[in-house]
Swiss-Prot record:
Source species, domain of life: Viruses
Biased composition range(s): Polar residues: 7-18
Organism: Human adenovirus F serotype 40 (HAdV-40)
Keyword Zinc: yes
Protein name according to UniProt: DNA-binding protein
MF terms (GO), sorted A to Z: DNA binding; zinc ion binding
Organism taxonomic ancestry: Viruses, Varidnaviria, Bamfordvirae, Preplasmiviricota, Tectiliviricetes
Biological process according to GO: DNA replication; DNA-templated transcription; positive regulation of DNA replication; viral DNA genome replication; viral DNA strand displacement replication
Modified residue annotations for Phosphotyrosine: 141
Binding positions (Zn(2+) 2): 342, 344, 396, 412
Keyword Cytoplasm (UniProt): no
SUPFAM superfamilies, per the entry: Domain of early E2A DNA-binding protein, ADDBP (SSF47724), Zn-binding domains of ADDBP (SSF57917)
Length: 473
């Protein structure tokens, strides 16, 4: 064993060449050419898209809809989360807005556009804003529960506003003095003005319905003495008028008392005693020159004054009354707030009625004003009526007087004077200030412009009376 030689490890030449102890040397680096540009950054290829099966869209349920402009919907998903979705008008593509709502991670590619609230406050629609105010007023002024629960800003729900104003008047203004105005009509006009303020405050105004039934008329009846203008904007024609009234009627007794020189009791062609009143200063529309008394042409505006001087005095009275009430007024001095629609015409259908399409304007004389001395009165508002002792009164478009036969058209007991109409607006503003914080909303009353739609109607349109049957015969 001692003489045996030590054995050397046997390794094949191939293994010796590839062994890590004897790794082959790297090839020499090549020098880059000067004209070769090396990119600063190697572009990274996008990862291969993963194939994800399409997931079914979550079921959505509309909780409620807000009647704003544009409208909104509160939608609840199957997971219980809610978001607000805006309803775009027809023909307008929806805006591309991202949904920032925190949701559970989902692989669905469906994107829902929502309305983002930059102020991080709950969205309140115009309908909700108006309903909050109306609920407050209805609870405070004791509106019945049935009407309160069914209130939805519909045009035919005007009685809610009237009841609010009536309760407020009973609590705050008992014994309200009125001049040739019925209390019912005064409350009606207060309700209309209150409705206009509520709709303006909330932003739920209907463009097809004017709630006040009023207009601002640039009348031009005080620019020149003896010159009156009708609703066409043209000068009214002076002609003679002969009126016969029953002796027992209210108008006949008033004519005998106020105009003893022009009114007399005579017998008509049938042998009955009547009061005959002759008016030499009557004024009519230019379209009614050839018409008899109380007869109007198809193109007439329906405006007629039996005494032109008395009518101009009434226009001067309301002008002086407004100037005394608003001494800093700039634009409204020559304009008149007038009622266009009485209870007969205050309907959202817009169907013309038989007769006049506007309220009848009549000048009424203030009695016992001659006994007052202007130097003894310091109130400028009262001085306007002392200086011009006539007021303009708006009545039903086709009024029916006591002891007289009614006409074919509809009629009501609407009656309010021009000063009391302005007073109704003032009291509504006071009611608003007592119940709503902040500035008074701007109420826009349209300016009067003559339209052929307002012409006198001698023939009524065929009307439907309703029928529940499917077939007429």
């Amino acid at each position: 064993m001692a003489g045996r030689q030590q054995e050397l490890p046997t390794i094949t030449p191939y293994l010796q060449e590839t062994s890590p102890e004897r790794a082959p040397s790297l090839p020499p680096k090549k020098k880059l050419r000067k004209n070769v540009q090396v990119p600063d950054r190697v572009p990274v290829l996008p990862p291969s898209p993963e194939v994800v099966p399409d997931s079914e869209e979550e079921e959505e349920e509309v909780v409620y809809t807000g009647f704003s402009h544009p409208g909104v919907q509160v939608v609840q998903k199957a997971s219980g989360k809610r978001y607000v979705r805006r309803l775009e008008p027809k023909g307008v593509p929806p805006p591309s807005e991202e949904n920032n709502e925190e949701e559970e991670p989902s692989t669905s590619k469906a994107v829902t556009s929502v309305v983002l609230n930059p102020q991080a406050e709950p969205l309140v629609s115009a309908w909700e804003k108006g309903m909050d105010l109306m609920i407050k007023l209805m609870e405070k002024y004791h509106v019945e529960a049935e009407e309160k629960n069914g209130f939805k800003f519909l045009p035919e729900q005007s009685n809610v506003y009237r009841k609010i104003c009536q309760t407020w008047l009973n609590e705050e203004h008992r014994g309200l003095p009125l001049t040739f105005t019925s209390h019912k009509t005064f409350v009606e006009m207060m309700g209309r003005f209150l409705r206009a303020y509520v709709e303006s405050y909330a932003g739920v105004k209907n463009n097809e319905w004017e709630p006040t039934g009023c207009a601002i008329w640039l009348h031009g009846c005080t620019e020149q003495e003896g010159v009156l203008r009708c609703y066409h904007g043209l000068e009214m024609i002076q002609k003679e008028q002969l009126v016969e009234m029953d002796v027992a009627s209210e108008n006949a007794q008033r004519a005998l008392k106020e105009h003893p020189s022009r009114a007399k009791v005579v017998q008509n062609r049938w042998g009955r005693s009547v009061v005959q009143l002759k008016n030499d200063d009557a004024r009519c529309c230019v379209e009614d020159v050839s018409c008899a008394t109380n007869v109007f042409s198809a193109k007439s505006c329906g405006l007629f004054f039996s005494e032109g001087t008395k009518a101009q005095t009434a226009f001067l009275q309301i002008e002086a009354f407004m100037q005394a009430e608003y001494p800093k007024m700039q634009n409204g001095l020559k304009r008149l707030l007038m009622v266009m629609r009485c209870d007969c015409l205050y309907k959202p259908t817009g169907v013309p009625q038989l007769g006049r399409q506007m309220c009848k304007a009549t000048p009424f004389a203030l009695s016992n004003v001659d006994s007052l001395r202007a130097e003894e009165v310091t109130d400028k508002v009262a001085l306007a009526s002392i200086q011009y002792p006539c007021v303009l009164v708006y009545q039903c478009a086709n009024p029916v007087y006591r002891n007289s036969r009614g006409g074919q058209g509809p009629n009501c007991d609407f009656k309010i004077s021009a000063p009391d109409l302005l007073g109704a607006l003032q009291l509504v503003r006071r009611l608003w200030g007592e119940n709503v914080d902040g500035p008074l909303p701007k109420m826009l009353i349209p300016e009067f412009k003559w339209s052929s739609r307002l012409q006198y109607r001698n023939v009524a349109l065929p009307a439907s009376h309703g029928d529940g049957e499917k077939e007429p015969f």
